[in-house]
Amino acid sequence: MNAEMRTLVEIVLRDFPSAQAIYLFGSYARGEQHTRSDIDLAVLLPVDIARAAGDLRLSDTALALAKQARRDVDLVNLRLVSTVFQNEIIHTGVLLYCSDEPARQEFEMLALSAYIKLSEERADILRAFLRTRQAYNVSQ
């Protein structure tokens, strides 16, 4: 982890000392960033703290991160984003910090299980859409 990312992790931990994990995702995680790229970070918090914290995109923490990085920073509360987004972050992101390996592994396992279940549930819907090219009033 480079010095810039280490500093950003420290800012997140200053505001959320109980953070269980922090992931870098998006263009920076893929090594495809350019001059106008934002930095995408996801923080895994204990369940009760995640609920209390809510959406972090416009939080004081996100603003402090953006000020430090001198670019936009998208900070997401990993427990509160969609199942599809959780799966994307887990599978394409880079783990920058982990203080609770069992909690991280449990979250990743549950998120993957939820994603698999969602994929199974929507498989028939997707097949019907591909067959008819209609999103509504499609009989199976």
Where are these regions (language model features)?
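Short hydrophobic/aromatic beta-strand micro-patches
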Residues: 42-46
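Catalytic core of pol beta-like nucleotidyltransferases
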Residues: 1-21, 29-35, 48-140
